Amino acid sequence: MNDFSAWAEIDLDAVAHNVAALKALTRPACRLMAAVKADGYGHGMCEVASVALESGASALGVSRIDEALDLRNHGITAPILVLGHTPAHRCREMVDQNLIQTVCALAEAQALSRAATAIGATVSVHLKVDTGMGRLGINTVVPGRTAPQEAAVKEALAVLDLPGLAAEGVFTHFACADSADKTHANAQFKRFSTLIQELEAAGRPVAVRHAANSAALIDMPETHLDMVRAGIAIYGLYPSAEVDRQKVALKPAMAFKTRVAQVKKVPAGFTVSYGATYTTPKPTVLAVVSVGYADGLNRLLSSRGFMLVRGCRVPLVGRICMDLTMLDVGGVPDVAVGDEVVIFGSQNGAFIGADEIADALNTISYEVVTSITGRVPRVYCNGSSSAVRR
């Protein structure tokens, strides 16, 4: 037993299972990129990256160049695509560390081209096109049309012709692939496919075409192309309740846990926590547990959420504090200081998922797992071995 106040258990065997299961949904020639940005969605970027690469992934996706450099510093040599913007003055790092940089506009690509030619180098890039996400990328959208606007094709061709850049890939990102209604996703894919055809017709084919995120990987096999980008699904969480979960069995990789710090009997009419917003309706037993909003437990769960104690669901009562939270354990016998408490995960056959917490907060599981803060140790389990990252 560890002595942590709160900790996240990461099942690396579950990550391995998920990556292999997702790769099995694709054609053999289709590569899988594991998205490990945001510290591996809170699970640990380097730890997840290593397991993903051993389990069927052949490339990694990060948001920022410093994440890519961290992976390189940990000895990871696989292709890494930086999905976000990087200032052109960091060109030397891109080249020296063999990174692939996303470019999203002609002006951005021109700046990177000038920086690369100034040092006599070539930077590998993937061109991103916006087909309906409204975020990064060359805008291809003409409202009411599924064909890309002509200016977008010209801009893309201009990027591909720049010196100092090796345009290895072109990609887009779906806004609604996790919806049961695929109308918007289909329109995006049509724009993307047409743009690719026009690039090819102009004599500028691109080797690596990718569009599918986790949701499209599961639900839209026609979008798999040369590579898929798996994010939330490699961590065992489905992109939404609307994707077809029958197509792949995922295993949640993270459990978030804490311990009982104090147990106290209280009478009816007893007020709990800041603001005295909760009053006990009858005599009961409170357990004070060593987790709070500084650990990533959202304060909006105050008097709304549940945790598991001895395999029983018990309610959070009163406002969540920075470091502590109170539970009503009056219905659970023999609760004691030091008992394990599960915020999400399994205990004695009971389960609370990150999705359940997300639903209570009117958000998504992505936010739940990435919100767990750096002061929470990650405890890694892989087969019979375990390791801790503080």
Curated annotation (Swiss-Prot):
SUPFAM superfamilies linked to this entry:
Alanine racemase C-terminal domain-like, PLP-binding barrel
- UniProt lineage: Bacteria, Pseudomonadati, Thermodesulfobacteriota, Desulfobacteria, Desulfobacterales
GO cellular component terms given for this protein: cytosol
Query: Could you tell me which species this protein originates from?
Result: Desulfosudis oleivorans (strain DSM 6200 / JCM 39069 / Hxd3)
Where N6-(pyridoxal phosphate)lysine occurs, the residues are: 37
What is stated as this protein's family in its record? Belongs to the alanine racemase family.
| InterPro entries referenced in this protein's UniProt entry, alphabetically | Ala_racemase, Ala_racemase/Decarboxylase_C, Ala_racemase_C, Ala_racemase_N, Ala_racemase_pyridoxalP-BS, PLP-binding_barrel
The EC number(s) given in the record are: 5.1.1.1
Q: List the Gene Ontology MF annotations in alphabetical order.
A: alanine racemase activity; pyridoxal phosphate binding
Q: Which domain of life is it from?
A: Bacteria
UniProt-listed Gene3D superfamilies = Alanine racemase, Lyase, Ornithine Decarboxylase, Chain A, domain 1
Active-site positions on this chain = 37, 274
What biological process terms from GO does the record include? D-alanine biosynthetic process; peptidoglycan biosynthetic process
**Uppermost EC category:** isomerase
Q: In which pathway does it act?
A: Amino-acid biosynthesis; D-alanine biosynthesis; D-alanine from L-alanine: step 1/1
User: What is the protein's name according to its record?
Assistant: Alanine racemase
